């Protein structure tokens, strides 16, 4: 059998991934992904997560953010996580596997949230990348719009929102939408985010009902 050759871009990604200090650090610490260092840095600056809070984590797999969040909110807090991909269980995290773009999955997610509002909505979602920037940007903006819709449905007054967004077409319009809904909005580029990546994190606090 002929071994499949990687494209130049995927070969570069693989080399970056295995040489990445944050990947190595995550493996050494037994963490689920390098993404935990991003939310850790955001938490250090913005103090979004506190004991007893209820958190919704969108695009949760493999579970780095959920793992971090449940450690922050503690036994009296709740983390409700959702992803289209499977995720190994985490003590204290209520995980729903499914595509929350589908009405049945969204309904199940809202049912798990229950009648009480949540304190934080966080989203590290990204689409499956096609390699065509225009297509990928449109897909990613669609996902972040859905995450903002989730805020409108479940976030309590003065709640917080942290979302990964790729800079490009639609970014400025989306940022303005968030500014209308929250009292304070910041853009973060964590040190653990690859410099070449267009990703940034919008951190919004003080949700206006």
Swiss-Prot record:
The active site is at 164 (proton acceptor). GO terms for molecular function: rRNA (uridine-2'-O-)-methyltransferase activity. It is an enzyme of class 2 (transferase). InterPro entries: RNA_methyltr_RlmE (IPR050082), RNA_MeTrfase_FtsJ_dom (IPR002877), rRNA-MeTfrase_E (IPR015507), rRNA_MeTrfase_gammaproteobac (IPR004512), SAM-dependent_MTases_sf (IPR029063). One of its GO terms (cellular component) is cytoplasm. The keyword S-adenosyl-L-methionine applies. This is Ribosomal RNA large subunit methyltransferase E. SUPFAM superfamilies: S-adenosyl-L-methionine-dependent methyltransferases (SSF53335). Belongs to the class I-like SAM-binding methyltransferase superfamily. RNA methyltransferase RlmE family. The keyword Glycoprotein does not apply. Specifically methylates the uridine in position 2552 of 23S rRNA at the 2'-O position of the ribose in the fully assembled 50S ribosomal subunit. S-adenosyl-L-methionine binds at residues 63, 65, 83, 99, 124. It holds the Pfam family FtsJ. Signal peptide: none annotated. Keywords: Cytoplasm, Methyltransferase, rRNA processing, S-adenosyl-L-methionine, Transferase. It is found in: Cytoplasm. PANTHER family: RIBOSOMAL RNA METHYLTRANSFERASE, RRNA METHYLTRANSFERASE 2, MITOCHONDRIAL. It catalyses: uridine(2552) in 23S rRNA + S-adenosyl-L-methionine = 2'-O-methyluridine(2552) in 23S rRNA + S-adenosyl-L-homocysteine + H(+). Its main location: cytoplasm. Its EC number is 2.1.1.166.
